[in-house]
């Protein structure tokens, strides 16, 4: 009867360890069959035996597990109760056998549990370190430290930046030199044209002075000609008067000839 209870408790514990918890909705960590067997023996003996021994053994187990307790994080309270429940109805005849077996297997079960849990924690640490190394390698050595982003400076980036800055400076200097040359050329053309204008202005002034002199001389000449014409007219008038009075026949004949000559022409 006790063997049937042990097999039932073993199957129940194995089913619990390999199936997810309904209440917690988390998966339990798989535990070796030998350890499950020992845990089944210890749980059945503790549930049927004295309560004082069970409290002391639970305290010792909590102290001995220590670091390895992290491996039971996925096991919920209901799973532990199912694992530790066993087959209480079938434990009436084998209480003494279970008490004696528990005394010898308690130390070995806790040691094996600590060893397995320590190995699992080391594996998890190695996996975490590997993931961190992969992430650092994929990001190329860059990341965030205290909220600030840092990047490793690459030499090609510095060289390209220097080259581009040099090209920009050269372009700026070329533009400046081109503008300076254009300004110099423009100023030279303006100076040449201004010199030509000054020469033309001076020539115009000289010509105006000459024209003014000629005009003044022409005025004087015209005035002199007017005076001469006036004197000549006066003399002709005087001669006509004299010829008309003193020589009227000759004067009239001479006048008729002059009129006929003008008509024939």
Curated annotation (Swiss-Prot):
GO terms for cellular component: BLOC-1 complex; endosome. GO terms for biological process: endosome organization; regulation of protein localization. It holds the Pfam family KxDL. Keywords: Coiled coil, Endosome, Transport. Its main location: other. Component of the biogenesis of lysosome-related organelles complex-1 (BLOC-1). Belongs to the KXD1 family. This is Biogenesis of lysosome-related organelles complex 1 subunit KXD1. It comes from Vanderwaltozyma polyspora (strain ATCC 22028 / DSM 70294 / BCRC 21397 / CBS 2163 / NBRC 10782 / NRRL Y-8283 / UCD 57-17) (Kluyveromyces polysporus).
């Amino acid at each position: 009867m006790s063997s049937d209870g042990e097999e039932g408790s073993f199957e129940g514990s194995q089913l619990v360890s390999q199936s997810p918890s309904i209440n917690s909705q988390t998966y339990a960590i798989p535990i070796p069959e030998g350890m499950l067997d020992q845990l089944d023996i210890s749980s059945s003996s503790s549930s049927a035996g004295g309560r004082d021994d069970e409290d002391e053994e639970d305290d010792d187990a909590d102290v001995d597990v220590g670091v390895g307790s992290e491996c039971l994080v996925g096991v919920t309270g209901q799973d532990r109760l199912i694992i530790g429940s066993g087959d209480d109805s079938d434990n009436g005849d084998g209480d003494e056998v279970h008490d004696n077996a528990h005394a010898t297997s308690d130390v070995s079960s806790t040691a094996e549990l600590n060893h397995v849990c320590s190995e699992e924690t080391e594996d998890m640490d190695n996996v975490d370190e590997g993931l961190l190394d992969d992430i650092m390698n994929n990001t190329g050595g860059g990341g965030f430290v205290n909220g600030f982003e840092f990047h490793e400076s690459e030499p090609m980036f510095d060289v390209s930046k220097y080259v581009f800055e040099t090209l920009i400076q050269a372009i700026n200097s070329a533009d400046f030199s081109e503008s300076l040359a254009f300004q110099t050329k423009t100023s030279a053309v303006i100076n040449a044209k201004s010199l030509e204008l000054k020469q033309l202005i001076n020539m115009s002034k000289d010509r105006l002075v000459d024209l003014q002199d000629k005009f003044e001389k022409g005025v004087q000449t015209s005035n002199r000609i007017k005076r001469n014409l006036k004197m000549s007219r006066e003399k002709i008038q005087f001669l006509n008067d004299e010829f008309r009075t003193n020589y009227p026949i000759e004067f009239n004949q001479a006048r008729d000839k002059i009129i006929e000559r003008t008509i024939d022409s």
